[in-house]
Amino acid sequence: MLHDRPPALDHWLYASRSTIEPAWAARSVDLLAIQSASRNAGLGLTGALLFTGQCFVQALEGPPAALDAMRTEISRDRRHTGVVTLAEGPLAHRRFGDWSLAYSGNSIYLAEQVHRAIARGDGAPALMGLLQAFAIPDGGARRTEMPQDT
């Protein structure tokens, strides 16, 4: 008798420096979030994106092949540089279940938290907690599209 197993899931948490002209950053990143949410939904990826005005922090999770393809695409994107993997590996269950991309833009508080966590060198758990906090109801994230059916 075969048991139904949940599909394999991997996750990737990274940080990078923005190369977007500051005058255009808010609009550019809003459009990026909308486009990414749609693409992520089609690939079965979920996650969250934080933008401080100077850097990005993003957590993505989903099927390993889809996540690998997205990692390659993100690593080649000219809107940022210095992509640093903070955490990666298999997941037992999704942390951002119905968010193809939860997104929160620039704020002083957010920028301070992100920069402090990156500077420590061991800030991956703190950053993951921050991303998850934004993805809970009334946590501050904006939906960039309708939630996926799960």
What are these regions (language model features)?
Residues 1-150:
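Charge-rich, low-complexity N-terminal segments
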